[in-house]
C-alpha cells in the first residue's frame, strides 16, 4: 500500500470521525446534506475555482484526449450521485476529472418507495434500489444550460419505469434528443437492477435498436453501461454489438445483485431487501469484466472501469488492464475528496516510476505497481 503523509493521515482521521457521525443519520438524509453543501460549491464561482486549484491534482501526465474530449484527470464521478445535474459544476472542484450525471429518464419519476438506500460499512459498500428517481430530461436540460464551467460531463440515460419495453426505443431517443448536445458524451444504461425488466434490454436483439436510436439523436459519443452479473457469453455479445454499431465505448460495471462473499451478516442484508450493491464487493468481478472486454474489443473502443476502485493500486491495475478512464461513487462516500486525490497522485507516481510520459501509454500495458 502507498504511504500517507502525516497531514493526509490527519485529514483521513477527521473524515472517518465525521463519517461515523453522518452514519447515525439515514443514508438519503446524508445524501441531501451533501447535495446542499456541493450546491454551494456549484453556485459560488470563486469558491469553485479556489477549491479546484487546491484540491485537484494538476499533472499533464494525467491529461488525455478520449473520443475527441480532453479529460484532465482519469477518475470521474460515477452516475447515481448527481441525478439532476444540480451540482454539475462542483465535481471538478473536489478533484474529479469529469462527472457522469444521472441516471436521467425521459419523464420525471419519484423512484422506488423509501427506505431505498442502505450502508454496509463492514464491506465498504452501499445497497440501493433508488429506481431512477429524477426530474426528467427536460428539467435536467435546463440545469445543464445554466452551467458556468466547461468541466467534462457525461449524461447517463435510462428507461422511464412506466414505459413498456416495446416502447423503450422511443423513450431513450427522447432523452438523447433533449440531453445529448448538452453533454460531452452519453451513456445508455440498461444495467440497473432497480427498474423492472431493464436488464432484459441488455440482450443484443433488444439493445441494438436502442443504441442505434440514441446514436441518431445526438452528435456526441455514445457508450453503453453493462452489469457485472452478465454471463461471459453475454458480455462478448454486447461488446461485439458495440463494435458493430461503432459505439465510443463501454462502461463496466454497474451494481451487482449478488450477495456472495459479504462481511455484513446475511440476516442484515436480507432485511435490507432487493437492490444493487456497489463498492468493494463488486471489485473482483468488475476487473474480470474489464479484462475480458479489453481482450475482445479494447483496441477498438474506450473502456471506462467502475466498481470498487478504493486504492491507487486498484486504480493502476484497472488502467494497466485496459481502462482508459475510471469512475467511482461508493469509495467517494467512504473516503471523501482525499480518495480522489490519492488515486490521481498514485497514478501520476506510477507513470513516473515506469518512465511513461502520459497515462495513455499505460492503458492495457499490464505494468505492475512499483513501490
From Swiss-Prot:
Enzyme type, top EC level: oxidoreductase
EC number, UniProt record: 1.3.5.2
GO (cellular component) term, any one: plasma membrane
Gene Ontology BP term (one): 'de novo' UMP biosynthetic process
Keywords linked to the UniProt accession: Cell membrane, Flavoprotein, FMN, Membrane, Oxidoreductase, Pyrimidine biosynthesis
Binding residue positions for substrate: 83, 128-132, 189, 194, 254-255
UniProt protein name: Dihydroorotate dehydrogenase (quinone)
Lineage, top ranks: Bacteria, Bacillati, Actinomycetota, Actinomycetes, Mycobacteriales
Protein's gene: pyrD
